[in-house]
Amino acid sequence: MAEPTQFAYRTLKGIGIVDAAPVYEPLPGFLKPEGNSRCCTYSPCGRYFAWASNEGVTVVDASVGHVITTLPTPNVYELGFSPRGSYIITWERPSKDENGDALKNLKVWRTAEEIKEGEEKVVVGRFVQKSQTGWNLQYTFDEKYCARCVTNEVQFYESGELSIVWTKLRAEGVTDFAISPGGNQSVAVFIPERKVRRNVIRDLN
């Protein structure tokens, strides 16, 4: 029998995962969490399902409902995955440290990795991301590279090494961009209208 279609739901009291046609029943191995949760999402590949609660982030194997990993970050308001689910990205509300400096509130984690007993997961990279709009990184289809939009440019990184900018695409006034989902690795940038300049969308290979 083919794998059933699946959907998840979030209410004020908890989260559930349901196998739809042809079985229409709750996912057998999933223990429904209770209490407040801020957000939830599937990975684009459908392999993982994650949600954020007051205690942290939990990731399960969507096919069986078993917990894959937990992230020790309790203030998450947005969740995202890379295309193949290798990385999970979290966004927390902007805040400052004792010196008034902005804390790095966008964090990238490996979804599944072996962790020694007594150790916690370590972030792959982190950034200051003030806006909740367009907060997430964008990845190439093979997850080799990822990118984010900053003032007047799009910065590209090797996905496993986020401490060093791999290359930059300079675009004065850019506010948004998109990486093509296929193998040609084109990038489109959006530059909004300003004074006499009209909206501009540029497609760059």
Regions found by a protein language model. Give the residues of each.
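Short loop/turn segments that connect beta-strands within beta-propeller blades
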Residues: 20-23, 62-65, 111-114, 159-162, ...
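Residue position within the beta-strands of beta-propeller blades
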Residues: 9, 51, 90, 148, ...
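Short coil/turn segments at the loop-to-beta-strand junctions that recur within blades
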Residues: 33-37, 73-77, 129-134, 169-175
